[in-house]
From Swiss-Prot:
GO cellular component assignments: cytoplasm; excinuclease repair complex
Residues holding ATP: 31-38, 639-646
Name of the gene encoding the protein in the UniProt record: uvrA
Cell location: Cytoplasm
Described purpose of this protein according to its UniProt entry: The UvrABC repair system catalyzes the recognition and processing of DNA lesions. UvrA is an ATPase and a DNA-binding protein. A damage recognition complex composed of 2 UvrA and 2 UvrB subunits scans DNA for abnormalities. When the presence of a lesion has been verified by UvrB, the UvrA molecules dissociate.
Zn finger (C4-type) location: 252-279, 739-765
Zinc as UniProt keyword: yes
Major location (coarse): cytoplasm
Species in which this protein is naturally found: Vibrio parahaemolyticus serotype O3:K6 (strain RIMD 2210633)
UniProt name for this protein: UvrABC system protein A
C-alpha cells in the first residue's frame, strides 16, 4: 500500500472531497486561512489515524487516553498510527523545562549518577569511603548520655506493601523498625498502602552515648552496613535534633560530610530526593514585593503611598499613627524622604520591640494594646496564606513577585546534587549553557577507562538529542529554560526534535506550520529535519504557507478556492510544477510570480525629530541595546530566532509603554535605563496570538462588541417592546432569555468512560441556546440564534443599514475573516484567527492617529493572499498617523516596511545587539546581517 485514499471527507467546511496522498512522502497542505487545511490534516486524517490505533487497545487502556471524535468521512484506507505536532504552547507546568520535554535531562541525570564525582560542598574535596572506626569515633563525639538509635535503611522511597521485607526482618531477630518516620514494633507492623512510596529503616541498636561503647558500636555498625549496603543512620530516639548519615561509600575526609549513593533521582527536581527543600524544585520563591506594594513613594503615608493604609482606612491608619508616635516620624512627609530604618519598620515590622497601639472604635472608646508591629509585607503575607476567599487572594497576588530561590540559587536542586562534577562541571552549569555550547561540551568530553565505557551509550543519546535541537534551529535555548516561556513555534520544534529522537518508522506525522518564528536562515535546517523524518520511512503531512516548504514537498495539496463556506474543495494537487500550471490555484499564481505582494513604489520618509528612544535595555540576552523607533511609520523588527526581538519589544518596550500610557500596574518591564518620546502616543495596543477567550461562550460577536448593539436591535422590535424584553433577554450568559436546560451552551457534555466525552445538542433548545419565547422575536425575519449562525460576510449585508454594526463587521472582512461565524466559539479559532479578531476590534475603534500598535508575527497561519490583505490594513493604520511595530520573519512583510531594525547576529548569547537599521534598501546592503542576505533578492 503506497498511498492513503480519502473518500467523502465532510469535516467542518470540507465539501465531500476525495484525494490520494502518497505514503512515506513529504506532503504540504496549503491554501487560504480558513479554507479547511486543518480540517483535512488534523480533524480528519490525524483524528482517524489516532482513533483507529486507540480503538485497538483494551477498554482498560482506553480510559487513560483521550479518544478523538470519529470524523465525518466515508472511507479512509492506508492510514498509519498518527502523531500530531501542533502549535499549542507546550505546558503551563512550571516544572517543565526544555531539558525535561526533550528527555535530554533524563540522560544527564543518568550520566551524573553513573560517572559523576561527588565533592564536599565546604572543602570541595572528592568524597571518600568512611571506615567503621571513623563512624564509631564520630558517634562517641556526641554529648555523653544522648539517647540514640542506629538504623539500617532497607527500603528507600519505594511503592508497595513490603510485607515480605518486614517478615524477613522480624525473622532475623530485629524488634523495631522506623517506617515513614514513625518507630513501630516488627511483631505488629502497620499495613502499608500499596500505591504510596515508603521508607523502611530497621533499628539495629539503641544506646546511650558513653566512652565504653566502642566494641558494641563497631559490631552494630558492621551489621548495619551489611544490611543496608553501606549506609548507616544515627538518629536521636526522641526524634528531635540532627540525624547523622554514615556511608561506607562516600564521605569528606575533613568534615565527614557524606551522602547517599548517587542515583538518577538525586538529580531530579521533580523528586523529593533531589529537589531543593526551600523552593520544592521550582527554582523561584514568591514574595510580597515592596516596589509593588508602595504605589507612589513621592506621596506621604497619609496621602496613600501604600494602598489600603491611608487615612481612608481608619483601622490600619490608627496603627501607623501609633507607630509614628513611637518612632517619631511624620505621616505627612513623602515616603521616600523617611529614613531607610523607618521604611523597614513600616514594611517589615518592629521585630520584638513592643509598641503601644491606641484603637478608637465608632463610639469613641479608646483601647490601648502593647504588641510588636507585624509590618505591612508580613500582614499581606498572612492574609494571603490564611484567606479562603478567591477574590482576596487575586487582589493580593498583584503585589507578589518571584525571585530566584535563596537556597539553591535558582538551580532547583538540593545541595548534594549541586556538588557532583564531571570534568569540573556540575549538572546545573550544564543546563545553563546554550544547547549549542552543551553539544560542544559533550563532543569534546574525554573520560578515562571504566567511566568512559559506562558513559558511552548515555553520551551518544545526549549528543543525538542536542544535535536534533540544533537542527531545528533551537541552538540558542538552554536546557533549563521553562516550557511556559517558549513561543508556539519553539514548542512545536522541540516536540519535533523529540520525535526524531524517538526514531519511529511507519508513522504518519501531522505538523502545523513548523516554520513559525523561524528566520529564513534556519528554515533550511528545519526542512532537512522534515525530509529526514520522511527518509526514516514515515509519511509527513505539513500544513504550511512557507514558499520554501512548498517547493521542497514531494506532493502539494491546495485547498480552497476561498475561506470558510467558500473553501473546502481541493483546488489543485500534485507536484510543485503541477500546482503552478493549474490556473485555478491561487497558491500557484503566487509561486509562479503571476501574482505578488509588491514592493511599495516609495517609502514613507522618517522624521528624525519624531522618534521613541529606549536606552540601555539589558533583559535576557540584550547587550545594553539602544532602540530608536520612528513615530508614524510601519517598522519591522527582524533577526534570527533567539536574537532578542521578543525581549526587546514585548518584555521591555511594550511593558514600559503599557505602564506609562495605559496606566498598567502589573506590567514589569525587563531592565532598561531610560525612555523618551512616548508623549507622541495616547495609548499602546499589543495584538498577540493568545486566545480571545477560553470558553465556548466567548465568540467574535461578544469580543468585538457587535453583540451588544445586535441585542439592542432585537430589544427594540415591536414584539420585544410589547413583551417588555430588554437587551439582557437576548444574552445566553444570564438567566431570562437563555435555555436553562443547557444554561445557554447549546450542548450538554456527557462523560463517557472508555470513550471521548460526547457533546450532544441540548434536547430542549435543539442547540439554539435560547428558550422558545426569546426565539419568537424576529428582526428582519431572523431570530437571534440565526444571526449568531451567520458568517461575517452574510451579516455585513444583513446589517448594512446599521452603521455601528456594519463598520465593525467590515473590519472583520478587511482582516480576511469573512468566513467565520459571529457566534463561533473562541476555542475553535486558530492563533492567527484570534489575532486578527483582536486586530479587527482595534481597527473598529475611533482612530486618534496617535496609537502605537505592536504585533508579534501577525502572518502566522496566513496564505500569500491573506498577507496582502493584512498589509493593506497595517498600511491603513500607518497612513492615519499611527505607529505600527511588527516582529516578523516573513520577507513579504519585511520588504513593505518603512523601517527595519535587525537584531543579531546570532541567537542566544551570540545575539542581543542591533546590527542593522534603516529602510529595507539600506538594510539589504549590510554585511553580516542574515536578514539582509535573504531580503536583497526580494527588492529587485
Amino acid at each position: 500500500m503506497d498511498k492513503i485514499e480519502v473518500r467523502g471527507a465532510r469535516t467542518h467546511n470540507l465539501k465531500d472531497i476525495n484525494l490520494t496522498i502518497p505514503r512515506d512522502k513529504l506532503t504540504v497542505i496549503t491554501g487560504l486561512s480558513g479554507s479547511g487545511k486543518s480540517s483535512l490534516a488534523f480533524d480528519t486524517l490525524y483524528a482517524e489515524g489516532q482513533r483507529r490505533y486507540v480503538e485497538s487497545l483494551s477498554a482498560y487502556a482506553r480510559q487513560f487516553l483521550s479518544l478523538m471524535e470519529k470524523p465525518d468521512v466515508d472511507h479512509i484506507e492506508g492510514l498509519s498510527p498518527a502523531i500530531s505536532i501542533e502549535q499549542k504552547s507546550t505546558s503551563h507546568n512550571p516544572r517543565s523545562t526544555v531539558g525535561t520535554i526533550t528527555e535530554v535531562y533524563d540522560y544527564l541525570r543518568l550520566l551524573y549518577a553513573r560517572v559523576g564525582e561527588p565533592r564536599c560542598p565546604t572543602h570541595h574535596a572528592p568524597l571518600a569511603a568512611q571506615t567503621v572506626s571513623q563512624m564509631v569515633d564520630k558517634v562517641l563525639e556526641l554529648p555523653e548520655g544522648s539517647k540514640m538509635m542506629l538504623l539500617a535503611p532497607i527500603v528507600k522511597e519505594r511503592k508497595g506493601e513490603h510485607v515480605k521485607t518486614l517478615e524477613n526482618l522480624a525473622a532475623q531477630g530485629f524488634i523495631r523498625a522506623r517506617i515513614d518516620g514513625e518507630t513501630c514494633d516488627l511483631s505488629d507492623p502497620p499495613t502499608l498502602e500499596l500505591h504510596k512510596k515508603h521508607t523502611i529503616e530497621v533499628v539495629v541498636d539503641r544506646f546511650k552515648v558513653r566512652p565504653d561503647l566502642q566494641q558494641r558500636l563497631a559490631e552494630s555498625f558492621e551489621t548495619t552496613l551489611e544490611l543496608s549496603g553501606g549506609i548507616a543512620v544515627v538518629a536521636p530516639m526522641d526524634g528531635d535534633g540532627e540525624e547523622i548519615i554514615f556511608s561506607a561509600n562516600f564521605a569528606c575526609p575533613q568534615c565527614g560530610y557524606s551522602m547517599q549513593e548517587l542515583e538518577p533521582r538525586l538529580f531530579s527536581f521533580n523528586n523529593p530526593a533531589g529537589a531543593c527543600g526551600t523552593c520544592d524544585g521550582l527554582g523561584v520563591q514568591q514574595y510580597f514585593d515592596p516596589s509593588r506594594v508602595i504605589q507612589d513613594d513621592s506621596l506621604s503615608l497619609a496621602q496613600g503611598a501604600i494602598r489600603g493604609w491611608d487615612q481612608k482606612n481608619y483601622y490600619y491608619f490608627q496603627m501607623l499613627t501609633s507607630l509614628a508616635d513611637h518612632y517619631g516620624f511624620d505621616l505627612h512627609a513623602p515616603f521616600n524622604s523617611l529614613p531607610k530604618k523607618t521604611q523597614d519598620v513600616i514594611l517589615k515590622g518592629s521585630g520584638r520591640t513592643e509598641i503601644e497601639f491606641k484603637y478608637i472604635n465608632d463610639r469613641g472608646d479608646i483601647r490601648v494594646k502593647r504588641h510588636p508591629f507585624e509590618g505591612i509585607l508580613n500582614t499581606l503575607e498572612r492574609r494571603y496564606r490564611d484567606t479562603e476567599s478567591n477574590s482576596v487572594r487575586e487582589e493580593l497576588a498583584k503585589y507578589i513577585s518571584t525571585k530566584s530561590c535563596s537556597s539553591c540559587g535558582g538551580t532547583r536542586l538540593r545541595l548534594e546534587a549541586r556538588n557532583v562534577f564531571i570534568a569540573d562541571t556540575t549538572l546545573p552549569e550544564i543546563v545553563e549553557l546554550s544547547i549549542a555550547d552543551a553539544l560542544t561540551f559533550f563532543q569534546t568530553l574525554k573520560l578515562e577507562g571504566q567511566r568512559a565505557q559506562i558513559a558511552e551509550k548515555v553520551m551518544k543519546e545526549i549528543n543525538d538529542r542536542l544535535q536534533f535541537l540544533v537542527n531545528v534551529g533551537l541552538n540558542y535555548l538552554n536546557l533549563s529554560r521553562s516550557a511556559e516561556t517558549l513561543s508556539g513555534g519553539e514548542a512545536q520544534r522541540i516536540r519535533l526534535a523529540s520525535q526524531i529522537g524517538a526514531g519511529l518508522v511507519g508513522v504518519m506525522y501531522v505538523l502545523d506550520e513548523p516554520s513559525i518564528g523561524l528566520h529564513q536562515r534556519d528554515n533550511e535546517r528545519l526542512l532537512k529535519t522534515l525530509t529526514h523524518l520522511r527518509d526514516l520511512g514515515n509519511t509527513v503531512l505539513v500544513v504550511e504557507h512557507d514558499e520554501d516548504a512548498i517547493r521542497c514537498a514531494d506532493h502539494v495539496i491546495d485547498i480552497g478556492p476561498g475561506a470558510g463556506v467558500h473553501g473546502g474543495n481541493v483546488v489543485a494537487e500534485g507536484t510543485m510544477d503541477e500546482i503552478i500550471a493549474n490556473p485555478n490555484s491561487l497558491t500557484g499564481q503566487y509561486l509562479s510570480g503571476a501574482k505578488e505582494i509588491a514592493v511599495p513604489k516609495e517609502r514613507t520618509p522618517r522624521d528624525p525629530k519624531k522618534t521613541v528612544e529606549l536606552l540601555g535595555a539589558t533583559g535576557n540576552n540584550l547587550k545594553n541595546v539602544d532602540l530608536s523607533i520612528p513615530v508614524g511609520l510601519f517598522s519591522c523588527i527582524t533577526g534570527v530566532s533567539g536574537s532578542g526581538k521578543s525581549t526587546l519589544i514585548n518584555d521591555t518596550f511594550f511593558k514600559i509603554a503599557h505602564t506609562q500610557l495605559n496606566g498598567a500596574t502589573t506590567a514589569h518591564p525587563s531592565p532598561y535605563k531610560s525612555i523618551k518620546g512616548l508623549e507622541h502616543f495616547d495609548k499602546v495596543i499589543d495584538i498577540d496570538q493568545s486566545p480571545i477567550g477560553r470558553t465556548p461562550r466567548s465568540n467574535p460577536a461578544t469580543y468585538t462588541g457587535i453583540f451588544t448593539p445586535i441585542r439592542e436591535l432585537f430589544a427594540g422590535t415591536q414584539e420585544s417592546r410589547s413583551r417588555g424584553y430588554k437587551p439582557g433577554r437576548f444574552s445566553f450568559n444570564v438567566r431570562g432569555g437563555r435555555c436553562e436546560a443547557c444554561q445557554g451552551d447549546g450542548v450538554i457534555k456527557v462523560e463517557m468512560h472508555f470513550l471521548p466525552d460526547v457533546y450532544v445538542p441540548c434536547d430542549v433548545c435543539k442547540g439554539k441556546r435560547y428558550n422558545r419565547e426569546t426565539l419568537e422575536v424576529r428582526y428582519k425575519g431572523k431570530t437571534i440564534d440565526e444571526v449568531l449562525e451567520m458568517t461575517v460576510e452574510d451579516a455585513r449585508t444583513f446589517f448594512d443599514p446599521v452603521p455601528a454594526i456594519a463598520r465593525k463587521l467590515q473590519t472583520l472582512m478587511d482582516v480576511g475573516l469573512s468566513y467565520i461565524r459571529l457566534g463561533q466559539a473562541a476555542t475553535t479559532l486558530s492563533g492567527g484567527e484570534a489575532q486578527r479578531v483582536k486586530l479587527a476590534r482595534e481597527l473598529s475603534k475611533r482612530d486618534t492617529g496617535k496609537t502605537l500598535y505592536i504585533l508579534d508575527e501577525p502572518t502566522t497561519g496566513l496564505h500569500f493572499h491573506d498577507i496582502q490583505q493584512l498589509l493593506t490594513v497595517l498600511h491603513r493604520l500607518r497612513d492615519h498617523g499611527n505607529t505600527v511595530v511588527v516582529i516578523e520573519h516573513n520577507l513579504d512583510v519585511i520588504k513593505t516596511a518603512d523601517w527595519i531594525i535587525d537584531l543579531g547576529p546570532e541567537g542566544g548569547q551570540g545575539g542581543g545587539e542591533i546590527i542593522a537599521q534603516g529602510t529595507p534598501e539600506d538594510v539589504s546592503q549590510i554585511e553580516g546581517s542574515h536578514t539582509a542576505r535573504f531580503l536583497k533578492p526580494m527588492l529587485k
